């Protein structure tokens, strides 16, 4: 049986973040040189160990990659080694099965410069060489806008289409041909890959030229080379659209219980979306089917060893039983070491042995209360990661302007009503703060739960108008009633009051109720608000402070579980609600009038609020698109600032709020649809997200620290120093720079013979195709070299027989030439 060798164990580095790659050779794991990372042969299988540094520990992902022409034995060995490596890591890794052509975004993301799939494999003598070599002739089809994959295709114009980028690699010259319908970003990615091949594989001693498909006449020398190597230019195929995955499929979750009964796989459906963590028992194994797009296997810590060891084979049998494609992605999750992607398929995911955030979290029902650490406003811009965690750009002491929507227009709110938010209204709040000498803006759009649809629409429209007035600089934050973020509360210094309904308009004819009850939550000036609840006894809670306002009195009711800080903040906000003297009432010592005002005694929540297991929140970045008329979100694993492209829009999900980042060159439709797109994301999220989650719209160049803090080493000057595609193209030079090299490539001697040909003096005689095909040596015409039959053909016959020009044939690897000659009867 295949075993992880002592040599592999000895060389295995499990403490340093980064990649390690092995190829399966003669059923053994053989290390791949780091200089060739990102280059894979389609006849082989590989194992990739990715180590990531998290806040307090390391996480591990093991991928095994299956080339389309690899043998079943190699595939089996790769799977076994993956399991053994996970055992060596004591079950701390997530295992991934990757099949050529259907690699996960996480896998592609490891190779930022591009993933190159080459023909051949170890069985045909193909090696991962470190030395510079110019003996290369191939055509690479580059697919993808972000994490690109480049595969070798037939060296012929018929391989081309109008929508993609192609690299014609001729050793000393690489020609990048851009389809006329390819995007700027696809061209930039293609150029990055071409330069990577030049610098890493050829030591920088290769020319790179670019041909734009819509203007081929501008590159006559390069087109001469292409036509020489690829044959006569032909009509191009139409652009091939990228595979589109419907959001509904991603959201279609089914959880199955797995058991291995007497060697037979038995699966039983347990639940469908939305899923909760308590469905997973530590004693069992489960399969989670994400609409057939991806299969997850979860192994409970106390499950029997046979079931745990057979996790991957269970998944493959499940795929077969469901008649899913063999290339379906598989992830094996260990109990306690689950990936962020897996965790966020559940409504909430907690880990009892982890600490998260900046304070202890307590909960009753679905309401959480955070014991805040001391707030330090000076740290927000120096340490944006603190700003991101606390969701604070400063301490709320900046300048504020507030408007209310009236008759669909903006009307300034009288100063005496600042901090009062009525559920029947919508408000716009513009907050101005300084970083150094520069002004920055936050634009809050607060929408009451009882406001009319016209007012809600008008609030969004007026936000756009106000945003334009300030040159698009404000960060827009949509705040549904009840979802007020800490910074908004901090502006009112502990005096924010939210009313169930009503309005503060001067012409309001409705009178508010004579008795009102407010639940106060918060421990300091930066996190306190009073929220109106129905004035009934059953809405009390022993863990909080409540303000009960009647016509004759104002009570401050203190539950047994509230803290001293909460009582002090409640006194402050109570002064905003009522000017009358407050009567402090301790739970259990209420006067009769108190209960009478609430309509009589009634049971209410009086159990001690328990400490919640720490909620695990991993920020996730998605590239968004609605160009097809459907919302698409592509996740970017291990993201950093470089992943934010100026042409696109992105969504940063930090669970209790969602940022929508707009690049300055994004198309207008995507800019206008920012809020709608973010809401669509929440609606189609597999875990069943709260549609009222706050949405924050951020424009490139005006990012607040609450956003930048989620990125490692954010550079505010990045885009001012970044070179455009046009700049990079200009740096490559023009056709005069490589005239000598193009002359070498187009010289007649390479028309028929390749570099390995055993050339005789003078040209070989030409014979008709039918006199050479499937003929034994004794039946060949006189003068024919039996080992070089193809060189006795005319160019027309050669092209007819092989489906390509002699030059294209000569560019193929030696093993493929031999296979083609056998196939065509010319061996």
Swiss-Prot record:
Changing residue 824 to A: Does not reduce binding to PIP2. Changing residue 461 to F: Complete loss of phosphorylation and interaction with PLCG1, does not reduce lamellipodium or ruffle localization, inhibits cell migration. Inhibits interaction with PLCG1 and lamellipodia localization. Changing residue 81 to F: Reduces activities regarding actin nucleating and actin severing, lamellipodium or ruffle localization and cell migration. Changing residue 604 to F: Complete loss of phosphorylation and interaction with PLCG1, does not reduce lamellipodium or ruffle localization, inhibits cell migration. Inhibits interaction with PLCG1 and lamellipodia localization. Residues 2-126 are annotated as: Necessary for homodimerization. SUPFAM superfamilies: Actin depolymerizing proteins, C-terminal, gelsolin-like domain of Sec23/24, VHP, Villin headpiece domain. Pfam families: Gelsolin, VHP. Tyrosine phosphorylation is induced by epidermal growth factor (EGF) and stimulates cell migration. Phosphorylated on tyrosine residues by SRC. The unphosphorylated form increases the initial rate of actin-nucleating activity, whereas the tyrosine-phosphorylated form inhibits actin-nucleating activity, enhances actin-bundling activity and enhances actin-severing activity by reducing high Ca(2+) requirements. The tyrosine-phosphorylated form does not regulate actin-capping activity. Changing residue 286 to F: Reduces actin-severing activity and interaction with PLCG1. Complete loss of phosphorylation and interaction with PLCG1, does not reduce lamellipodium or ruffle localization, inhibits cell migration. Changing residue 145 to A: Does not reduce binding to PIP2. Changing residue 815 to A: Reduces interaction with F-actin. Residues 112-119 are annotated as: LPA/PIP2-binding site 1. Keywords: Actin capping, Actin-binding, Apoptosis, Calcium, Cell projection, Cytoplasm, Cytoskeleton, Phosphoprotein, Repeat. Changing residue 822 to A: Does not reduce binding to PIP2. Residues 816-824 are annotated as: LPA/PIP2-binding site 3. It comes from the Eukaryota. One of its GO terms (biological process) is response to bacterium. The modification Phosphoserine is found at residues 366, 735. One of its GO terms (cellular component) is actin cytoskeleton. Residues 138-146 are annotated as: LPA/PIP2-binding site 2. Consists of a large core fragment in the N-terminal portion and a small headpiece (HP) in the C-terminal portion. The core fragment is necessary for both actin-nucleating and -severing activities, whereas the HP binds F-actin strongly in both the presence and absence of calcium and is necessary in actin-bundling activity. The Gelsolin-like 1 repeat is necessary for the actin-capping activity. The entire core fragment is necessary for the actin-severing activity. Epithelial cell-specific Ca(2+)-regulated actin-modifying protein that modulates the reorganization of microvillar actin filaments. Plays a role in the actin nucleation, actin filament bundle assembly, actin filament capping and severing. Binds phosphatidylinositol 4,5-bisphosphate (PIP2) and lysophosphatidic acid (LPA); binds LPA with higher affinity than PIP2. Binding to LPA increases its phosphorylation by SRC and inhibits all actin-modifying activities. Binding to PIP2 inhibits actin-capping and -severing activities but enhances actin-bundling activity. Monomer. Homodimer; homodimerization is necessary for actin-bundling. Associates with F-actin; phosphorylation at tyrosine residues decreases the association with F-actin. Interacts (phosphorylated at C-terminus tyrosine phosphorylation sites) with PLCG1 (via the SH2 domains). Interacts (phosphorylated form) with PLCG1; the interaction is enhanced by hepatocyte growth factor (HGF). This is Villin-1. It comes from Homo sapiens. The lineage of its organism: Eukaryota, Metazoa, Chordata, Craniata, Vertebrata.
